[in-house]
Amino acid sequence: AGRDFHNFNVVYRQNNAYKVVAFTATQIPDIEGRLYPSVLSGELYPNGIPIYDESKLEELISEHKIEEVVFSYSDISHEDVMHKASRVIASGTHFKFLGGEPTMIQSSKPVISVCAVRTGCGKSQTTRKIAEILKASGKKVAVIRHPMPYGELAKQEVQRFTELADLEKHKCTIEEMEEYEPHITRGNVVFAGADYQ
């Protein structure tokens, strides 16, 4: 969860040609049974959008007569993606990826994206090193981190971290603190939250 919310926000939130019926998630504790809240999901979804455990994927496809599943997880291997695609296709449903262009954050500044196949590959360390190199060359640096949806999503719409007190202000989890604190102590501004727009 995290990248899927961003993809929804930029591609589907205001697109009445689609009806998004659910998000699925894995790896995030206690996310099942929660809602992507209406304050974030927009006027087409006044009741929010339910979040289910991925184990219910086939059940959701059948129950809601879903025509298309859009894959939006991050940190996953090709093999795992293809297993998920097989589950969807075996259920008689289209399986889709969104291309880069429609999901990119619009910026007037150059952007460097740091991605990897799974958690633990070194994205955080790589991001800190890139920021260090850019700052040493006189550039201003800000870090954007897709959300870690552990807390109350409506209160995580937009987050800006410039000092350690901001971690408490935004009620960050230990995982979030481990990610943001090294940037803050190095003087990097960190932006996170469920809605970058």
Which residues does each PLM region occupy?
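Short N-terminal binding/cap micro-motifs at the start of the first secondary-structure element
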Residues: G2-N7, K123, G151-L153
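Hydrophobic anchor at the start of a short beta-strand
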Residues: V20-V21, F95, K139-V141
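Walker A (P-loop) phosphate-binding motif
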Residues: T103-G151
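ATP-dependent carboxylate-amine ligase catalytic core
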Residues: I133-Q197
